[in-house]
């Protein structure tokens, strides 16, 4: 991928506009998880140290365009940034028309960009106003790279220079390493409740990987496709033919979708529901499958240990309940100890990484949800495509 990297530019005295992804959870005016802010700080601090006049904006929540409300304010985010920098940071409420000055080496935060009219629909007039504020536009929000909006795509068309930030560059390099030229064997783990929401990902990965591990509710549809009884488990019966096709298609080229030989069941979805281990052939009509059993988990751990590349998106069981979390724990630990390159992404996956404390043992953790999935699907990310276009002049 050929794009300009912010680290390649001389930024001294330049007006730099950074689009970051600081869409963090806020409760009672306080940020409850600052991971995305921390991830964005490297680009911000790099530009400040370089002596640039630094402006950063992000979206937060889902505000109504043209109507600013206090709960949509980036103030809680600014409080965290100020604390990290150890200095006061200005928050500029009305900024699209300019009218504010930034000193060399200073950072100002521009209020929630999704409040601006024309932002979501990528209106040129809005994008041109943004571009007029800067000499260099830096896209650092991989989490919104799959959306063409005025602050992620439009501004990149009109800014004098458009570059990728440190975080975005790292994300794209990691994705390219895992998907464009993966070390073999390549294993993908795709979990989640529904095949329908991950169908395009499953189809795209089924053509690339050596083993496609399915987990969660998705796995039940594949179990059913193999003629197993899944009882009252979450299962999309209308997608059984699709699951069969994927199994056959992969087998035809010597690849596989490993199917569980043992499962952990309960009768209802409840934190206190007792876990019952069964062979995959012995599931009763009133059972619900909530996890894979130890034999299946060990089989996956052995596959992961031999992998050159591991792409991980989603748990293999209801790991938020400990009695149904052993499968996900075994898989997580196998990934943590695997010598291969591991790339993980998605909210549930990150929750599992945090729960089992393997943050520093996964090669690369993507901060993005939707964009990560769309990249896995092989889709063009508009915010990245425009950076490549601009780099070619």
From Swiss-Prot:
Organism: Thiobacillus denitrificans (strain ATCC 25259 / T1)
EC number, as in UniProt: 2.7.2.3
HAMAP family named among the record's database cross-references: Phosphoglyc_kinase
Keywords, alphabetical: ATP-binding, Cytoplasm, Glycolysis, Kinase, Nucleotide-binding, Transferase
GO terms classed as biological process: gluconeogenesis; glycolytic process
Gene3D superfamilies assigned to the protein according to its UniProt record, in alphabetical order: Phosphoglycerate kinase, N-terminal domain
Protein family membership: Belongs to the phosphoglycerate kinase family.
Residues that hold substrate according to the record: 21-23, 36, 59-62, 114, 147
Keyword ATP-binding belongs to the record: yes
GO CC aspect terms: cytosol
Reactions that this protein is recorded to catalyse: (2R)-3-phosphoglycerate + ATP = (2R)-3-phospho-glyceroyl phosphate + ADP
Binding site for ATP: 198, 320, 346-349
First-level EC class: transferase
Name of the protein: Phosphoglycerate kinase
Disulfide bonds: none
Pathway the protein acts in: Carbohydrate degradation; glycolysis; pyruvate from D-glyceraldehyde 3-phosphate: step 2/5
